[in-house]
Amino acid sequence: MENLLSVENAILITGPTASGKSALAVELAKRYGGAVVNADSMQVYDTLRVLTARPSEEEMQGVPHHLYGHVPAGAAYSTGAWLRDVSALLPALKAAGQLPVFVGGTGLYFKALTGGLSDMPEIPEGLREELRMRLVAEGPEGLHAELEAIDPAMSASLNRQDGQRIVRALEVIKATGRSIAEFHRRLGPVLIDADEARKIVVLPDRAVLHARINGRFEKMLQQGAESEVRALLALGLPAVAPVMKAIGVSQITAMLKGEMTREEVLEKGAAATRQYAKRQMTWFRNQMDESWERLAP
């Protein structure tokens, strides 16, 4: 990391889960007098600190950390909401003389941060909840048929099984009377100039990454992941709530119901994490251009 000599307005660090990027963010924040800003869509929630690998106080090493655990578990939180939070945070960091060090595995956050994002409308919570419940009851194909009737062009561009995007498209057209495609064509402001930021994508060797993932999931169970899932289930959130999709929730839930042993939870949880990391690695390789420094720790 000795070649990190020129840092202008920000440091951006991404990479797959368990790649060591959070520790790198702390190291660089300490070196440059910075503050760490979360760019992971699961670590924003106020539950599942252990299961989402949110940094502990010890791991933060006294470095300021922002946008971690600030969203209630059942709340909707989009890329647009994250950008608004970042926009509100940046002036305070600048006033404090702290360099923002963004770190996380949500690639879309980084794309929006440096390229802008469509200014999407606010959706009434009642409408959002209604469509989520219908997705559970009817499945994605039923909602896709409804979208096809009122927004055929948009429906044609979506996979019939992609329930999340189908629901999002229905939310927008029902709330505004306009296709989500119209909003996609209008980009909001760019918050970070990519040409003046140090950009790093951490891509460990696959064997190294898999070993880290296997050890991490076992450690999570030892540190209280089971209790976190119990507390989450007690909230009675719908299965389609984003936080319910965190890796490990379904496996630990099955164990709590007596449907899976601890050994099976370890095996299946680690396997799901490895699959997720593989998808992340593919996305980063395809989406992060040559201006992103590849780091193989």
From Swiss-Prot:
<dbReference type="InterPro" id="IPR018022">
    <property type="entry name" value="IPT"/>
</dbReference>
<dbReference type="Pfam" id="PF01715">
    <property type="entry name" value="IPPT"/>
</dbReference>
<keyword id="KW-0819">tRNA processing</keyword>
<feature type="site" description="Interaction with substrate tRNA">
    <location>
        <position position="128"/>
    </location>
</feature>
<keyword id="KW-0067">ATP-binding</keyword>
<dbReference type="GO" id="GO:0006400">
    <property type="term" value="P:tRNA modification"/>
</dbReference>
<keyword id="KW-0460">Magnesium</keyword>
<comment type="function">
    <text>Catalyzes the transfer of a dimethylallyl group onto the adenine at position 37 in tRNAs that read codons beginning with uridine, leading to the formation of N6-(dimethylallyl)adenosine (i(6)A).</text>
</comment>
<dbReference type="InterPro" id="IPR027417">
    <property type="entry name" value="P-loop_NTPase"/>
</dbReference>
<dbReference type="GO" id="GO:0052381">
    <property type="term" value="F:tRNA dimethylallyltransferase activity"/>
</dbReference>
<comment type="similarity">
    <text>Belongs to the IPP transferase family.</text>
</comment>
<dbReference type="InterPro" id="IPR039657">
    <property type="entry name" value="Dimethylallyltransferase"/>
</dbReference>
<keyword id="KW-0547">Nucleotide-binding</keyword>
<dbReference type="GO" id="GO:0005524">
    <property type="term" value="F:ATP binding"/>
</dbReference>
<feature type="site" description="Interaction with substrate tRNA">
    <location>
        <position position="106"/>
    </location>
</feature>
<feature type="binding site">
    <location>
        <begin position="17"/>
        <end position="22"/>
    </location>
    <ligand>
        <name>substrate</name>
    </ligand>
</feature>
<feature type="region of interest" description="Interaction with substrate tRNA">
    <location>
        <begin position="40"/>
        <end position="43"/>
    </location>
</feature>
<keyword id="KW-0808">Transferase</keyword>
<comment type="subunit">
    <text>Monomer.</text>
</comment>
<feature type="binding site">
    <location>
        <begin position="15"/>
        <end position="22"/>
    </location>
    <ligand>
        <name>ATP</name>
    </ligand>
</feature>
<protein>
    <recommendedName>
        <fullName>tRNA dimethylallyltransferase</fullName>
        <ecNumber>2.5.1.75</ecNumber>
    </recommendedName>
</protein>
<feature type="region of interest" description="Interaction with substrate tRNA">
    <location>
        <begin position="164"/>
        <end position="168"/>
    </location>
</feature>
